[in-house]
Amino acid sequence: MSRVGKLPITIPEGVTVGLNDLEVKISGPKGELSKIFKGNIAISLAENKLLVKPLAANKSARAMWGTARSIISNMVIGVKEGFKLKLEINGVGYRAMVKGKYLNLMLAKSHNTKIEIPSHIKIDVPKQNIIILEGTDKEKLGQFASIIIKQRPPEPYKGKGIKFDNQFIPRKEGKKN
């Protein structure tokens, strides 16, 4: 029995849900999201609550049960409130700026790195070393953040690189002479 999957998803005011077999369309004040689910699950809407149930008792159906419930819950939160991620850049001369539809990163390379900003993500750079990402889709927001972090991942010796705001980087000692 999935502890996550058996919980109903309450639909808040201002959010509408459309069901078409395994396709879920959710719209709210921040935008609209839709997703088609695969697997042995059934999604039903009753009394302003969404319920996800497995159709079989096998392992893959139970795994998809909790996963589908979490994804739908994140979709509801995304269209109602949205998601926000904060990235921090550490290092001498490392900085970020937004130019048009590109994020321009200066990360001590021989060239500046340009990353195209997806249409569903808003980026704010209040300081040169802080990037704030906002969007309705939690999965796509995390994927875009990982693309940015991949440009210069944090290293354990001096702590230079791009990391999530609350991420802890374990530090190592340098060479001993």
UniProtKB/Swiss-Prot annotation:
InterPro entries: Ribosomal_uL6-like, Ribosomal_uL6-like_a/b-dom_sf, Ribosomal_uL6_a/b-dom, Ribosomal_uL6_bac-type, Ribosomal_uL6_CS. Coiled coil: none annotated. It comes from the Bacteria. Keywords: Ribonucleoprotein, Ribosomal protein, RNA-binding, rRNA-binding. GO terms for biological process: cytoplasmic translation. This protein binds to the 23S rRNA, and is important in its secondary structure. It is located near the subunit interface in the base of the L7/L12 stalk, and near the tRNA binding site of the peptidyltransferase center. HAMAP family: Ribosomal_uL6_B. NCBIfam families: L6_bact. Belongs to the universal ribosomal protein uL6 family. This is Large ribosomal subunit protein uL6. It comes from Rickettsia akari (strain Hartford). The gene is rplF.
